[in-house]
From Swiss-Prot:
Keywords, alphabetical: Cytoplasm, NADP, Oxidoreductase, Queuosine biosynthesis
Enzyme class: oxidoreductase
Annotated protein name in UniProt: NADPH-dependent 7-cyano-7-deazaguanine reductase
EC number: 1.7.1.13
Length: 136
């Protein structure tokens, strides 16, 4: 492969980058609307950038929710989460934005988002956000 061809392929967004950039949360119909149940999703490789330093921040996201009429499609959720990797955003803002999007798209009965950020500079941070009313 020539150097010119290699340089050319790195200048435009690659197909994976385009898919991530265009991603949005997709939901499908809850297969059992009559039953109250919980779904837990782990996303252990979340990244965004610190808005002050530009350094990467890493976190494990845990989503637990009780679906109402819709259920989150996992691949779309993964791609949506990957879209934050190059965005300079605070921990508080990104977790609230993700929660807003989850609530607006899925309309769950109840949802809990936990974000456990890896330590940086000897400081770690964990955020927990809840929305809705948990049902028994």
């Amino acid at each position: 492969m020539s150097t010119a061809k290699l340089e050319d392929s790195t200048q435009r967004p690659l197909y994976g980058e385009r898919i991530i950039e265009e991603s949005k949360i997709i939901c499908f119909d809850n297969p059992n609307k009559k039953r109250i149940y919980e779904i837990s999703i782990q996303l252990p490789e979340f990244t965004c950038k610190c808005p002050f330093s530009g350094y990467p921040d890493f976190a494990k996201l845990n989503i637990t929710y009780q679906p109402n009429l819709k259920v989150y499609e996992l691949k779309s959720l993964k791609l949506y989460i990957n879209n934050f990797r190059d965005i300079k955003i605070s921990h508080e803002e990104v977790v609230n934005r993700i929660m807003d999007d989850l609530v607006n798209e899925g309309l769950p009965h109840w949802i809990h988002l936990n974000a456990a950020f890896n330590p940086r500079g000897n400081v770690s941070m964990q955020l927990d956000i809840f929305s809705g009313q948990k049902r028994n």
